[in-house]
UniProtKB/Swiss-Prot annotation:
Annotated binding of a ubiquinone, by residue: 201
One of the Pfam families matching this protein, by short name: Cytochrom_B_C
GO biological process, one term: mitochondrial electron transport, ubiquinol to cytochrome c
Cofactor binding: number and manner: Binds 2 heme b groups non-covalently.
Molecular function GO terms recorded: metal ion binding; ubiquinol-cytochrome-c reductase activity
Keyword set includes Protein biosynthesis: no
UniProt source species: Cervus elaphus roosevelti (Roosevelt's wapiti)
Chain sites annotated for binding heme b b562: 83, 182
Protein name: Cytochrome b
Gene3D superfamilies: Cytochrome Bc1 Complex, Chain C
Length: 379
């Protein structure tokens, strides 16, 4: 008798994606982040759903409804902090996942990579609108500053901003629509993630060597299911350490002050995972230029397959490219630090140099280095 899991219309899909899927025998822990992102998404949707049961998206009651969740709802505090810190874990996994793709040349799977970049943008949009919902000072001013960037678009900018706001400033209409966006976007992310997986399974996974592994495949279950479970346990451990011991470590104290349009906080800054992009935005003294640099800093990922000049796919056997990659990582950490600093000497110049270096490494140094490596190997 043929196994039901191989014939049943629904179980067949699950079977081909998670059980009998042929996987390379040598994928390292860097390949765990895909499943971890899936777990993060499920966790965020579940905690978010329970928060939405008690949250009110009205300027008069939003802040106090979040306080009510933390004080009066059974285990509301843990749900709230799991959701807030879950977003941080989500972005840690995202950055690791993208970094893995860059290092091992996974961007040569064009459809998978491009859907991934769209996913990154969507997750960033979701996190941004979500940060506005508690209606604290940083929520309000963050929303004001970031949405205001759209006014840099020539001709239609001002109209566009007022259309997004639903008025002449960030107010009740803005909060209500941001809640609606924040509710719907995770489901769009889930759908996109399925498409991402669909395209990945057309080609099969890459592996650390970047060499086709068709000759040496193993079934996904039990080898990688057990490996993923270990990754999930570590993720949950790290998340719960954060939630139970330092829930406000990554948050901004200003967000414990209710939103006040008459009082601007001294330093407006987004959550830590946006600081690198915020630093790039601030490093350009022109508004439109800053916005373009901000968008380019993420959109540049789409160019990665075009900028790949090496005859090898992975960086595993390319020491010079490896050095550049880790310099890029250090540069991004520098930008993250600068994004959280006030706009004054020496931070301005450090931010500008780090921003220039970021684009210079990706657009100039990496392709040149790859070509040099080809020549050294007489390829």
């Amino acid at each position: 008798m043929i196994n039901t899991r191989k014939t049943h219309p629904l179980m067949k899909i699950v079977n081909n994606a998670f059980i009998d899927l042929p996987a390379p025998s040598n994928i390292s822990s860097w390949w765990n982040f895909g499943s971890l992102l899936g777990i993060c998404l499920i966790l965020q949707i579940l905690t978010g759903l329970f928060l939405a049961m008690h949250y009110t998206s009205d300027t008069m009651t939003a802040f106090s409804s979040v306080t009510h969740i933390c004080r009066d709802v059974n285990y509301g505090w843990i749900i709230r902090y799991m959701h807030a810190n879950g977003a941080s874990m989500f972005f840690i996994c995202l950055f690791m996942h993208v970094g893995r793709g860059l290092y091992y040349g996974s961007y040569t799977f064009l459809e998978t990579w491009n859907i991934g970049v769209i996913l990154l943008f969507t997750v960033m949009a979701t996190a941004f609108v979500g940060y506005v919902l508690p209606w604290g000072q940083m929520s309000f001013w963050g929303a004001t500053v970031i949405t205001n960037l759209l006014s840099a678009i020539p001709y239609i900018g001002t109209n566009l901003v007022e259309w997004i706001w639903g008025g002449f400033s960030v107010d009740k209409a803005t909060l209500t629509r941001f809640f609606a966006f924040h509710f719907i976007l995770p489901f769009i992310i889930a759908a996109l993630a399925m498409v991402h997986l669909l395209f990945l399974h057309e080609t099969g996974s890459n592996n650390p060597t970047g060499i086709p592994s068709d000759a040496d495949k193993i079934p996904f279950h039990p080898y990688y299911t057990i490996k993923d479970i270990l990754g999930i346990l570590l993720l949950v451990l790290f998340l719960m350490l954060l939630v139970l011991f330092a829930p406000d470590l990554l948050g901004d104290p200003d967000n414990y002050t209710p939103a006040n349009p008459l009082n601007t906080p001294p330093h407006i800054k987004p959550e830590w995972y946006f600081l690198f992009a915020y630093a790039i935005l601030r490093s350009i003294p022109n508004k439109l230029g800053g916005v373009l640099a901000l968008i380019s800093s993420i959109l540049i990922l789409i160019l990665m397959p075009l900028l790949h000049t090496s005859k090898q796919r992975s960086m595993m056997f390319r020491p010079f490219s490896q050095c550049l990659f880790w310099i890029l990582v250090a540069d991004l950490l520098t930008l993250t630090w600068i994004g959280g600093q006030p706009v004054e000497y020496p931070f301005i110049i450090i931010g500008q140099l780090a921003s220039i270096l970021y684009f210079f490494i990706i657009l100039v140094l990496m392709p040149i280095t790859s070509t040099i490596e080809n020549n050294l190997l007489k390829w």
